[in-house]
Amino acid sequence: MKILVIDNVNYEDYPTGGILNFYRNMLPAFGSDLLLAGITTDDRTPVGIWTHREIDGQEFEYFSMAKVTPSAKRPLIPERITNCFYIKKYIRRILTHNDFDWIVTHKPEVMYFIPDGFMSKTCYIMPGVENPLSISRYPWARKLAGVYDRFFLMPKAAKARKLLAAADLNDRKAFAERSKGKISVDKVIEFPTRYDDSIYGVKRISHDDNEKIFVTVGRLGWFKGWKLMIDALKQTREKVNNARLYFIGDGEDYDKIKDYVHEQGLDDSVNLLGKMAPKEIAVWLNKADVFVMGSMAEGWSTTLVEACACGVPCVVTDFSSAREMVADGKNGFVVSGRDERDFSHKMVEALGLNRDKVIEYDKKFERLAVSHLREDMEKILN
């Protein structure tokens, strides 16, 4: 089976996030059976033609749609809009390489420009089923969420051969309802995020007993709930005075977070560690006493899956799939609402969970290892 992947990533390290992680997992799983169309962040890869590119020691046929300069800052023009320009420009040229059985993408703007004649071999994978404009970094864009659903997303998604979603049943039902009859819930197949089991797993790492380590991983954006986690840490330190919160990741809110931490008098208790390689993240997850996530919305969170793979207790907000992964009192807690006192209470309670029992419970998620990815995708696509 040959798969053409089209997305605005470079399949190596930019932009960071769950979508890139998914493709990173696809590379070793499918190898040379993948054709890659994406972006480039280097000066070596030509734009606008099919060529060959080496990624992690493996050579792939590659089509770069744009040369992009990496930045953690919010661009003046939303990436979804700039994506549309170069996807529209090159989509037909990409499709001239017709040696593929399936087209796979996570991006609705890619799917929108795929000609209808190719939709019968298109698989659209949704990292979450919420309307992406509803959680946009741009306030004006959130006002267009309804228009986006009605005229942009749903009509095209209804034509896709396969719809996969990293979301639980309730959210998949909500997505089907939003389609106004265009898409049935049965067509939206649950497909959880995967973790790289060659990197993420249980490793006993000792740390200073005088410190209780809370770790969160993800983009530094408002929708990831950084304020909730910082406020909750401040509450937690009233009971656990050696509690510290470590942010792993980069993003447009870096300076805002630094300023807010200073305003709250938490300079010695909150650390922004920046972007890290997966192996470094795995070390921190194993070192952590508790993993925390304050997201306003998620699909099947990659970092939550990775945290469970490392056997660390998790305290998370009630986003899609949270209750699929976290069982209260077993391997962590799911917190309804966005009250920092409730979140803090569960952070403290999670410190008391038996780590060995958490590790034993989390073994049930070994089925989400990337070593099963190809087999699981082929069952759906064949």
Question: What is each model feature region?
Answer:
Residues 3, 102-104, 115-136, 164:
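Active-site proximal beta-strand in glycosyltransferases
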Residues 92, 144-165:
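Membrane-proximal helix-turn-helix segments that form the acceptor-binding/catalytic region
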Residues 164, 207-224, 230-233:
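Conserved donor-binding/catalytic core segment of Leloir-type glycosyltransferases
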Residues 258-276:
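Nucleotide-activated donor-binding/catalytic signature segment of Leloir-type glycosyltransferases, i.e.
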Residues 296:
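Aromatic "clamp/platform" in nucleotide-sugar-dependent glycosyltransferases that forms part
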Residues 313-316:
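Short hydrophobic beta-strand element within catalytic cores of glycosyltransferases
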Residues 328-329, 333-340, 348-354:
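Conserved acidic donor-binding segment of nucleotide-sugar-dependent glycosyltransferases
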